[in-house]
From Swiss-Prot:
Disulfide links within the chain: C3-C9, C4-C13
Tissue spec: Expressed by the venom duct.
Function: Alpha-conotoxins act on postsynaptic membranes, they bind to the nicotinic acetylcholine receptors (nAChR) and thus inhibit them.
Modified-residue entries (Cysteine amide), positions: C13
Membrane-spanning parts: none
Keywords tagged on the record: Acetylcholine receptor inhibiting toxin, Amidation, Disulfide bond, Hydroxylation, Ion channel impairing toxin, Neurotoxin, Postsynaptic neurotoxin, Secreted, Toxin
Main localization of the protein described in the UniProt heading: secreted
Protein name, as recorded: Alpha-conotoxin-like Reg1f
Family: Belongs to the conotoxin A superfamily.
Length: 13
């Protein structure tokens, strides 16, 4: 999985 947003990650692609 890839973090779509910068930390803190609230959305996972």
């Amino acid at each position: 999985d890839y973090c779509c947003r910068r930390p803190p990650c609230t959305l996972i692609c």
